[in-house]
Each structure stands twice: as C-alpha cells, then as structure tokens.
C-alpha cells in the first residue's frame, strides 16, 4: 500500500487571544482512494472526524498562556500515521485601577493606581485632549470652564506583548467653578452708612455675608446699615462666601469705610468787664 504521511496546517483568523476559533486544514500525503479516515484529538476533551475541522479553545487564566496538544490520525488501506502540533492560547489581561475621587470642583486633581493583572504595558487615556500616559499610577488635573457639570471618562488600556488587551474606565464629574464677586453701592460715607450690595457671583446657589460688625445675612443682595459712634473713621471688611449645590466655594472681601460724624463743640470763657 502507498505510504501515508499525516500533516495539517493551523490558522486562527481572529488572533490567538482567548477565546480562539482555530481552523485546521488537512495537508496529509495519502492516496485519494479509498476515502481516508480522519481522527482529531484537540487536547481539550473534544474530538472530530472531519477532514478540515474548526475548534474553539479557551484560556481562563489572566496571567499564563495555555498550550494544547492537537493530534491528527489519518488512516488509509489500514495504514495509519499521526502528527501532533501544539496550539498556544494567549491569556487576556484584566484592566483595573483604583482612584481617590470621581467628582469635585474644578480644577479636579485625581490620583489613580493601576491594579491590573497579566499586562506588559499600560496606557492612561484622559478624555480631555491630553497626551496618553504610561506607568503604574497617574496624577491628572481636569478643568471645567463651563457653567454646568462636565463629565470625563478616565480609561486604562492594558496590553500583552502578544497583543491581547483589555480596558476599563470610570466616569468623572467636574463641577463648575464658583466665582464670588459683588459691588458696593455706597463704599464710603458719613455714619451711619446704609448701603446695598449687587451680587455678581457666578455659578453659585448660596450666599453668606459677614459685615464685620457681628451681623450676617444669607440674602442674595442684602441692605445693611453700618454705624460709627467713635471719633475716628472705621473700615468694615465685608466678606461674601458664595457656594454651589456641589459645595464649590469662593470668597471675596471688600471694604466699607464709615467716616466719623463731626461733633460741634465750643467753650465760653468769662471775661472781666471792660
């Protein structure tokens, strides 16, 4: 009978990262008649009698590659030959990181630590136009120049030397900046000074006024009376603390000068008769 030689080719069109669909193509040297018999043992508990089978292979490890011994046995005229080749399924890394905060007022600085497994390279992607960064940790500052909440997605991409990859991301919410500002209708005058305040604060919801005389207010634009019973001019330092519903805060202080009222005073000196 003619001599037969078992042979086959292996192809994984989608690559060798878990899970892998592998195509096996018979390339044995054997007579075409009678019809040869094929028996495939894929080394994973599965078998096949097809000439050119397809088989799925898995690797549930995140750190080590898995190798399977695939054996083809061909039979013709009761003559047999076998060939064993190895199939290696590369592991997939798992992307994971810890982050110290996911929300806050602009500028928001975050610190993230890489907790991934099985990777050979890591890449931090910031979603704000900044260049990607590598390494086991990253510190990044996010800005928000709008008047509404601005979201960013911080992504960690990891990859092995074989090209197997994974990624994970977390949503960050950066709250708008609060700017405290106000104008004083009467910044200086003779006691008493009654003045209103024009509130020019931006992105604020709550206001706390301290008039530096023991009195406070939470009105948006309060009216206040400043007194001065001394003989000297007095300056009050008015403080406005503006805050948002997101607990973003800004403070500004401006002076109100209250001049002392002049006091008329004279003395009479009795003179002798002229």
How should these model regions be labeled?
Residues 1-274:
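Extracellular/lumenal mature domains of secreted and surface-exposed proteins
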